[in-house]
Amino acid sequence: MTALLREVIGDVLRNARTDQGRTLREVSDAARVSLGYLSEVERGRKEASSELLSAICDALDVPLSRVLTDAGESMARREHDAREAEQVAVANLGRIDAATKVVIPQVSMAVA
């Protein structure tokens, strides 16, 4: 399953905050957003408006363009990994391990 953009942006924002060693409270105060709402945004539960994203980025002193670039790169990696996993799964569908024994039960048909 592909991650939602709001989840990926939330991950990027959380990583930026924790890399700076800052608390949710500090950033929420600086961004003038409730702590609970910022937490929801970081966890990908709420979709942040462009105004809110800008305020959070200002509070973190991280350019919005950097957050969006990081989110795009993260989504591209996740999509690539998902495609690779799907290709491996499809390639393995037709293979039966030599040690695997397939038992096909005998079916008798009764005619009434």
Swiss-Prot record:
Pfam families assigned to the protein according to its UniProt record, in alphabetical order: HTH_3
UniProt cross-references to SUPFAM superfamilies, sorted A to Z: lambda repressor-like DNA-binding domains (SSF47413)
Knockout or disruption consequences: Depletion experiments (via anti-sense RNA) show greatly reduced induction of the clp regulon (clpP1, clpP2 and clpC1) after vancomycin treatment.
One function term, GO molecular function aspect: DNA binding
HTH cro/C1-type domain sequence ranges: 13-67
Domain of life: Bacteria
DNA-binding region: 24-43
Keyword entries, A-Z: DNA-binding, Stress response, Transcription, Transcription regulation
Induction of the gene: By vancomycin, requires sigE.
Role: Key stress-response regulator that plays an important role in multiple regulatory networks in response to different stress conditions. Probably controls the response to vancomycin treatment; vancomycin induces expression of the clp regulon (clpP1, clpP2 and clpC1).
This protein's name: Transcriptional regulator ClgR
